[in-house]
């Protein structure tokens, strides 16, 4: 079982992560989202408020959990995100893969609305920088996270 560091950008310290059902679903449905990319978490924290915080967690995988992993943007990834953003609730404990960031999200929404084709979507996103997200969708999954520290990114 490997131990890796994950980051969560927020406007508050999150010692005890929770899964919250909100008005809008995210790429992989409702869950607690982290990334293995510190700079990405920093951007999430910085844009959320004047008091941005990057929370740092150690993550130890659990082979008993149901995990879905997308190594890159694929048709399956696109279809899964489309379903989740439309309200689909899956039974995975953890989902990991690329993130539909703000730019990609606009292309995704145009694809879902039928304004562009699947081929056009892939053409538009193929040169975008890599992103990463890992989302936790059950209490068993959240038990894989251990809060290490938080860092304020702006004052």
Residue ranges and their predicted role:
Residues 5:
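Structured mid-domain segments that build the active-site/substrate or prosthetic-cofactor binding neighborhood
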Residues 23-48:
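Extended catalytic/binding region for NAD+/ADP-ribose chemistry, centered on the ART fold
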Residues 9-27:
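Hydrophobic transmembrane alpha-helices
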Residues 2, 14, 26-27, 47-155:
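Conserved NAD+-utilizing ADP-ribose enzyme module
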């Amino acid at each position: 079982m490997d131990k890796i560091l994950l980051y969560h950008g927020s406007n508050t310290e999150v010692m005890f992560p929770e899964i919250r059902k909100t008005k809008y679903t995210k790429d992989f449905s409702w869950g607690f989202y982290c990334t293995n990319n510190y700079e990405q978490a920093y951007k999430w924290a910085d844009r959320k408020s004047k008091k941005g915080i990057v929370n740092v967690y150690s993550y130890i995988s659990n082979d008993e959990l149901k995990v879905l992993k997308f190594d890159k943007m694929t048709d399956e990834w696109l279809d899964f995100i489309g379903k989740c953003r439309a309200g689909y609730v899956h039974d995975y404990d953890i989902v990991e893969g690329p993130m539909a960031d703000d730019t990609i999200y606009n292309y995704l929404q145009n694809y879902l609305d039928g304004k562009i084709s699947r081929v056009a979507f892939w053409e538009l996103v193929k040169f975008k920088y890599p992103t990463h997200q890992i989302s936790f969708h059950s209490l068993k999954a959240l038990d894989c996270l251990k809060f290490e520290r938080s860092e304020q990114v702006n004052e």
